Structures are given as structure tokens and as C-alpha cells.
Amino acid sequence: MAIIIGIDPGSRMTGYGILQQTGDKLTYIDSGTIRTDTKEMPERLKRIFNGLTRITQHHLKYADEPIYTAIEQVFMAENPDSALKLGQARGAAIAAMVALDLEVSEYTARQIKQAVCGYGAAAKEQVQDMVCRILTLDFVPQQDAADGLACAICHAHSSHSMNKLILNSAMRGRGASKKKGRWRLTEEDLGNLR
């Protein structure tokens, strides 16, 4: 079991989504946005940092399982000023997570869309719709919050796939045997996995 916090950074609005992963099952916990309505960039960064810190600390209090964070990588915008502001907002979000001793994984927008929609160039509305379907939500989250949830879903799929690869590699190197296309663990392997 794990808690995954997905972050969609933005200089005016940062979206976040929080899920619980239990094996293949994803359960919605929370989502929302941190709005930075001020014109001053340092104040915006402070609001992003403080908002994500407060939200994460709240969930850290109640979590018995490990917490992982995932954030969308910066894309190269046509406007260099926009790309710099987005990079700064992303930096504030990463700093907030690292200050809480949380590991941060990064994914491109294409990777996130591919994981959620099966198509790396999906529109924002498609991502929003698929997030609702995957998590069986009875409401539609705001787009930036849906993007945060999509980032968390992407991390869940990536980490679950990676865990399977690691387990398969460990079994191949040990006394496990393959029977009818499946790996059979020895008693020693089972003991090492506990």
C-alpha cells in the first residue's frame, strides 16, 4: 500500500491529486488547486510551497503507508518567459516535497497522457474524463486537479510495473523455476520477499 501525490505545477494555479494504491487498485483521497492570484512571482512561489507543504503534512499525519510524489516535467513553451515561470513554480513544488523528505518522480506530459488515456497527445478534456473513469469518481475535478490525479495515476502504473520487473528479475537470479509461463517461487524466495 502507498499514498501517491501527483502535482501539476503552474505559476497561477497548481493542481494536486492524492491517491492510495493497493496492488492494482487506486482509491481517490483528495484533489484540488492552489491558486496564486498575486502578481509578484516570489509571493506566488511562496503560496505554492506553503500550500503543498500544508496539504502534504495533513496527509502525512494520517498515513501509515509510504508516501510518494510525482510531478509533471516542464515542457518548452513558445514563450520563454512562460517556461521560466513554470519552471520556478515546479521548483517550489519540488522543494516543498523534498523539504518533507519525500522522493519526487518526474514524468513528461506525454507519459502521463499515455498512462491515463493510452494516447500521448490526448486533449485535457480526455484526460479529465479518463481520470473520472479510472477512479470511478461521481464528480468531475477541475482540470488542473485532474492533471494532478493523472500524474499520480501515471506514477502508480510506472511503480507497479517496475515492482513486477524487479520481482521477476529477483526470481530469475534465485532458485525459482518457470512452469507454464509463470514463475514458481522456492521456499527460500518466499522467505526473502517477506
UniProtKB/Swiss-Prot annotation:
Signal peptide (from-to): none
Pfam family, one: RuvC
Cofactor: how bound: Binds 2 Mg(2+) ion per subunit.
Binding-site residues for Mg(2+) 1, renumbered to this chain: 8, 144
Cellular component, GO annotation: cytoplasm; Holliday junction resolvase complex
Catalytic residue positions: 8, 72, 144
Subcellular location: Cytoplasm
Residues that, per the record, bind Mg(2+) 2: 72
PANTHER family tied to this protein: CROSSOVER JUNCTION ENDODEOXYRIBONUCLEASE RUVC (PTHR30194:SF3)
Function: The RuvA-RuvB-RuvC complex processes Holliday junction (HJ) DNA during genetic recombination and DNA repair. Endonuclease that resolves HJ intermediates. Cleaves cruciform DNA by making single-stranded nicks across the HJ at symmetrical positions within the homologous arms, yielding a 5'-phosphate and a 3'-hydroxyl group; requires a central core of homology in the junction. The consensus cleavage sequence is 5'-(A/T)TT(C/G)-3'. Cleavage occurs on the 3'-side of the TT dinucleotide at the point of strand exchange.
Protein name, entry field: Crossover junction endodeoxyribonuclease RuvC
Gene source species: Psychrobacter arcticus (strain DSM 17307 / VKM B-2377 / 273-4)
Gene this chain is encoded by: ruvC
